[in-house]
């Protein structure tokens, strides 16, 4: 057994190369140094490439999303402008329709009033004519009723002569 340097009851520094496995450790470190960079380097390079491509793809999707957002904002703005224009056009059209409706209503009222006035005039003329006719008929009836009493033969002769004379003068 090799002596332990600076040993004190169970703990110390062992300088025996074979007992401490320094050679085994050196072989493992040399193997790792020789073979690990190629193997681990390929894995790390592949991982780095994957991460870079994922980042690039994410940036492209971000750019597309920003373009889509910008396009959507433009479309929304355009749609709002069209909606405002349509709303204003509808207001103007509604006002024009309202004014036209009022105008037609006033014209219709004037036509109805004119029709009523002409109907009233026609009815008044008809009633007046009817009253004149009835008055004339009553006057003729009274005259016919009174005529035999007042008309004697002498008056009849004078009346006939006067009528013949009037016919001859015409």
UniProtKB/Swiss-Prot annotation:
GO annotation, cellular component aspect: plasma membrane-derived thylakoid membrane; proton-transporting ATP synthase complex
Disulfide-bond pairs as recorded: none
Location within or outside the cell: Cellular thylakoid membrane
Keyword check for Transmembrane: yes
Gene3D superfamilies assigned: F1F0 ATP synthase subunit B, membrane domain
Xref: InterPro entries: ATP_synth_B-like_membr_sf, ATP_synth_b/b'su_bac/chlpt, ATP_synth_F0_bsu_bac
Pfam families associated with the record: ATP-synt_B
Membrane-spanning ranges: 22-44
Membrane topology listed for this record: Single-pass membrane protein
Molecular-function annotations in GO: proton-transporting ATP synthase activity, rotational mechanism
Principal place of residence: membrane
Record's keyword terms, sorted: ATP synthesis, CF(0), Hydrogen ion transport, Ion transport, Membrane, Thylakoid, Transmembrane, Transmembrane helix, Transport
Function text: F(1)F(0) ATP synthase produces ATP from ADP in the presence of a proton or sodium gradient. F-type ATPases consist of two structural domains, F(1) containing the extramembraneous catalytic core and F(0) containing the membrane proton channel, linked together by a central stalk and a peripheral stalk. During catalysis, ATP synthesis in the catalytic domain of F(1) is coupled via a rotary mechanism of the central stalk subunits to proton translocation. Component of the F(0) channel, it forms part of the peripheral stalk, linking F(1) to F(0).
Similarity-based family: Belongs to the ATPase B chain family.
Subunit relationships: F-type ATPases have 2 components, F(1) - the catalytic core - and F(0) - the membrane proton channel. F(1) has five subunits: alpha(3), beta(3), gamma(1), delta(1), epsilon(1). F(0) has four main subunits: a(1), b(1), b'(1) and c(10-14). The alpha and beta chains form an alternating ring which encloses part of the gamma chain. F(1) is attached to F(0) by a central stalk formed by the gamma and epsilon chains, while a peripheral stalk is formed by the delta, b and b' chains.
Protein name as catalogued: ATP synthase subunit b
Native organism: Prochlorococcus marinus (strain NATL2A)
